[in-house]
From Swiss-Prot:
Name of the protein described by the UniProt record: Crossover junction endodeoxyribonuclease RuvC
GO annotation, cellular component aspect: cytoplasm; Holliday junction resolvase complex
Catalysed reaction equations from the record: Endonucleolytic cleavage at a junction such as a reciprocal single-stranded crossover between two homologous DNA duplexes (Holliday junction)
Native organism taxonomy: Bacteria, Bacillati, Actinomycetota, Actinomycetes, Streptosporangiales
Disulfide bonds: none
Listed Pfam families: RuvC
Active-site residues (renumbered): D7, E68, D141
């Protein structure tokens, strides 16, 4: 399975692509960032992020997308920009019918390092170890995006299978009720 991870941001939107499956070795395919200029108008920045994400989706053809869930920060302007970039990422994936999984920063940190309180350096170090790399992907936003993809492969795909099984079960029950007039 190929997963594209996205660490949303207005100035730097980290992106990483990882191939793998639960119980199998993981391989980093690519890592980088979509960048916009801080002095550009917001609509132009959002369009730039969309074009960049679409290009990554075209180039790497992922099976799923993992996006960092926006959490409340003290700086409202920062969280708004991050939320807008996150929405662009989700829309790009949804437009293609790709499964999207949102992961909190602490969930990703816990999956990668074993601690939800790990710092960026610890996450980067563990990403490099997990993927057998000489050094963490750069910039740090790309390493975070790769960590998101790993988190999806280790956790998100299982959660998705459970959700699909629940939906299938609910449909089966509904069909049985209809057949028996309940």
């Amino acid at each position: 399975m190929r997963v594209l991870g996205i660490d949303p941001g207005l100035t730097r939107c980290g992106i990483g692509v990882v191939d793998g499956a639960v119980g199998a070795p993981l391989t980093m395919v690519a890592a980088g960032a979509v960048r916009t200029l801080a002095d550009e108008e917001l609509p132009a920045r959002l369009l730039g992020i969309e074009k960049g994400i679409e290009q990554w989706l075209d180039d790497y053809q992922p099976d799923a997308v993992a996006v960092e869930r926006v959490f409340a920060q003290h700086n409202v302007r920062t969280v708004m920009g991050t939320a807008q970039a996150s929405a662009i990422a989700v829309v790009c994936a949804a437009r293609r019918g790709l499964p999207v999984s949102l992961h909190t920063p602490s969930e990703v940190k816990a999956a990668i390092t074993g601690s939800g309180r790990a710092d960026k350096a610890q996450v980067g170090t563990m990403v490099a170890r997990i993927l057998r790399l000489d050094s963490p992907p750069r910039p740090a936003d790309a390493a975070d995006a790769v960590a998101l993809a790993i988190c999806y492969l280790w956790r998100g795909s299982a959660q998705e299978r459970i959700a699909r099984a629940r939906q299938k079960f609910a449909r089966t029950i509904e069909l049985a009720r209809q057949r028996h007039g309940l």
